[in-house]
Design a protein with these regions (language model features):
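Conserved catalytic core of the tyrosine transesterase superfamily
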Residues: 2-18, 22-31, 38, 52-327, ...
Length: 379
């Protein structure tokens, strides 16, 4: 709980706070708490009052964060968090003042409001025809083929395959449980019931399609890990033991009197081969682990030659943009490239607004749109 730097005591409406907590996701609550703590810390250091904040304080705070490198999208979130805490405390919202709106608009004008996009993980990579073209560049198929057949490899193959099929966000992906997978009309495919997502805080639920590829990967992982219920994607602890060479037993007369006497020193020891032990956890993976898993899979695929048209410099550049969201962006672009309409894409990825799917397709649309097609023809 954050103790805000207030000008005077504020009466808290406990019922309102409880209702907001019940209606919000844990991620949203953590984000609000983090944003308000940062704002309160800045106010204390600069002799300002956190609540009720003045429009001048909010505008100056946004300016300060912009000077520290915060992106316009982040500044918009900070503004929304400050507004929310004032609403929850039933005091005047300073972010509605024209000064705050104009200051934020000026920052966006200066820095640009284009939001950095996760590098897409498309199934065949940056291809024009998702059905006929051969895979190239960074592609999901290459990553899947490069997975090892040990427990971490089996889990990662299933994890990436499901992530691409469904376009789930990291928090939604790690929340998948065995019980959420149900039969489909196609006997080789399955359906995934999504009980709650970022855009479905009321828990109405949704359904996503799991390809036969994903079904096979899930079956291999759950059989090897002995998972029958509960979280599907779990942490795998790996313990590796080095090999030890055989040791001959020592003759008694070679043992110095200054050594501690131990008859076992006279016994030979057999060679011990290297071995690896795995321990599959009971709980689900943390959402923050998904991005690092994708990057580790990319490095492995590159080392195995599965991304043969990439150089080491290409790899370093690509890794910088890969995040847990890359599979969602990649699926979005593949759907556009395959000719699906916006309504179908919004339904498949459970979008409520067309803004984000269109933003994710911005670069692809420029190349494959009308102007791009014409220029490609005329050179």
């Amino acid at each position: 709980m954050t103790k805000l730097n207030c000008r005077s005591p504020i009466t808290i409406n406990a019922e309102l706070i409880a209702a907001y907590q019940a209606a919000s996701s844990p991620h949203s609550l953590r984000a609000l708490a983090s944003d308000i703590e940062a704002f309160d810390h800045w106010c204390r250091r600069n002799g300002r009052v956190t609540s009720p904040a003045t429009p001048e304080t909010v505008a100056d705070y946004l300016d300060a964060r912009a000077g520290q490198g915060a992106k316009p999208a982040s500044l918009g979130r900070y503004k929304a968090s400050i507004a929310k805490i004032h609403q929850l405390l039933d005091i005047k919202d300073p972010t509605q003042a024209e000064l705050v709106k104009l200051r934020l608009r000026a920052i966006r004008r200066e820095k640009g409001s284009t939001q950095a996009q996760a590098r897409p993980l498309r199934f065949k990579g940056p291809v024009r025809n998702v059905e006929r073209d051969a895979p190239r560049g960074l592609n999901v198929r290459g990553l899947l083929e490069a997975c090892a057949d040990d427990l971490p490899g089996l889990r990662n193959r299933a994890l990436l395959s499901v992530a691409y099929d469904t376009g789930l966000r990291a928090s939604e992906l790690v929340a998948v449980e065995v019980e959420h997978i149900v039969d489909a009309i196609d006997p080789e495919a399955r359906l995934l019931t999504i009980s709650r997502s970022k855009g479905d805080q009321e828990g109405k639920g949704a359904t996503a399609f799991l390809s036969p590829r994903s079904v096979r990967a899930i079956a291999a992982w759950t059989a090897a890990a002995d998972i029958e219920e509960g979280p599907l994607f779990r942490r795998v602890q790996v313990r590796r033991y080095k090999a030890r060479a055989a040791v001959k037993g020592r003759r008694i007369e070679t043992i110095s009197g200054r050594e501690s006497w131990d008859l076992r020193k006279t016994l030979p020891k057999s060679a011990v081969p290297a071995r690896t032990e795995y321990d599959v956890g009971e709980g689900a993976l943390h959402p923050g682990s998904i991005g690092p898993i994708w990057r580790a899979m990319i490095r492995r695929a590159f080392d195995k030659g599965a991304l043969s048209d990439l150089t080491a410099d290409d790899l370093a550049q690509l890794l910088k943009g890969v995040s847990a969201h890359s599979t969602r962006v990649g699926l979005n672009q593949d759907l556009f490239a395959s000719g699906e309409d916006l309504a179908g894409i919004m339904d498949a990825l459970r979008w409520k607004s067309p803004r984000m799917p269109l933003a994710y397709n911005r670069n692809l649309a420029a190349e494959q749109g009308a102007a791009g097609r014409l220029i490609a023809k005329i050179g």
